[in-house]
Amino acid sequence: VASPFGSNRGTPVVTELARALPKSLGLLGVSLLLAVAAGLFLGVQAAVRRHSRVSGLLLFASAFGISTPSFFAAMLLIWLGVWLYARTGQHLFPVAGFGWDAHLLLPALVLAARPAAAVTRLSYNALLEIMDADYVRTARSKGLRPRVILMEHVLRNAGVPILTTVVVSLRFSLAILPIVEYIFSWPGIGQALLTAIQIQDTEAVVGMILPLALLFVVVNLVAELLYLQLDPRLQDARAGAA
């Protein structure tokens, strides 16, 4: 039986994975942090300021982010980086290559754009539904500060739908990772996978796909464990079964 971890252009696939996988995980991690932080912040702002121009603008931006293809967003950011270089003579936003500094910014923004927009939209909807709940009105009538109500009653109960959006967004980021890495020449597992497909290296393709599939499994497993912690209904069901 042949091992799926053969050779990629004379280099063992395991060696290629050891080189490329940390770069892909780093890019995914930074993009996920950007997406969750920006999405939650913008979603909270849109919900707190509902019926205002700020809320309408944020919702329009989130709809635009969801509907914009990632490769088109990548092309726009590359154009911006080239334009800034032509104007300033400095590589403020490098459009290709590897580095844990400015090189990371553009691919991370492309990976984070659509997930951030999705988190913004769903967190806005979830927060609005909870803010109109009876227990939130009771908390207001007791004179609790808006910040306390938001943190203790609203955000805590919006955790499950927001987590669902984050998980779906992370799956989407994993799916488009090879394209983004290839566009920005980021030397991660996605770029190595597309290169192996181009040269028809079957062993390398299989060896590159397996870690990506394993990442999907790990994401789903972690999500299920978090659901058990965040959803009281699942905790009660587990306690009843015991």
Predicted regions and their residues:
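Membrane-water interface segments at the C-terminal ends of transmembrane alpha-helices
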Residues: 60-91, 110-116, 121
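Short helix-coil transition/hinge motifs at the ends and kinks of transmembrane helices
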Residues: 4-8, 85-96, 239
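Short membrane-interfacial helix/loop motifs at transmembrane-helix boundaries
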Residues: 1-15
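Cytosolic-side membrane-entry/anchor segment at the start of a transmembrane helix
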Residues: 56-58
